[in-house]
């Protein structure tokens, strides 16, 4: 998770302790989505705690994600290089891929190798929140593609920006 699907920017210093353990409840929640409109409002109630960052990890990200009823994890996408792994902790989510849909409950997991052109995302179609761990490596030069939406990410001297597929910025 190197930020191709950015979230709101917040400054966070990991707690200074003698041990490398972190209480997830002490890690600030990032709510909402970094997508531009009209995509942002489609995400619903999504909260993410960047546990890997809180532990000082730099080569891969680990996020504790909570999806409220009706929320989705992201727009359906695939990565050119980033491997992604998800492990469901509570509730039920529906994994939507190019091949269809599959319900995942507690203890189930899914993985997406980088470069595999199988766009995916999760939707919480249940009546209660669902939580899962999301793990992804951080590879410079990774890009994400969104087959269902007019969205791409670009990068210039000012950082990452959202654009239409024809290059016009949002």
Task: Cite the ranges covered by each PLM segment.
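Conserved short histidine dyad/triad with adjacent acidic residue
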Residues: 45-48, 63-79, 117
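Short, conserved beta-strand element in jelly-roll/cupin
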Residues: 64-68, 79-96, 135-137
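Ligand-binding loop in jelly-roll beta-barrel domains
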Residues: 56, 114-142
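A short, N-terminal "cap"/entry segment at the start of jelly-roll beta-barrel domains
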Residues: 3, 7-59, 144-170
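Short, charged/polar surface micro-motifs in flexible loops or helix N-caps
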Residues: 68-72, 92, 101, 116-117, ...
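Short strand-coil-strand connectors
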Residues: 58, 96-100
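Short acidic-glycine-tyrosine-enriched beta hairpin
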Residues: 99-114
């Amino acid at each position: 998770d190197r930020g191709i699907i950015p979230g709101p920017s917040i400054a966070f210093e990991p707690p200074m302790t003698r041990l490398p353990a972190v209480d997830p409840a002490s890690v600030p929640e990032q709510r909402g989505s970094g997508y531009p409109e009209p995509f942002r409002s489609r995400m619903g109630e999504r909260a993410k705690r960047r546990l890997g960052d809180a532990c000082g990890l730099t080569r891969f990200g680990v996020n504790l994600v909570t999806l409220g009823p009706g929320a989705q994890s992201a727009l359906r996408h695939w990565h050119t290089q980033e491997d992604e792994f998800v492990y469901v902790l509570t509730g039920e989510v529906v994994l939507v891929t190019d091949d269809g849909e599959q319900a995942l409950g507690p203890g189930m997991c899914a993985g997406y190798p980088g470069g595999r052109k199988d766009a995916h995302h999760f939707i919480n179609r249940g009546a209660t929140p669902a939580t899962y761990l999301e793990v992804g490596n951080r590879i410079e030069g990774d890009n994400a593609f969104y087959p269902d939406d007019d969205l791409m990410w670009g990068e210039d001297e000012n950082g990452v920006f959202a654009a239409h597929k024809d290059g016009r910025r949002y």
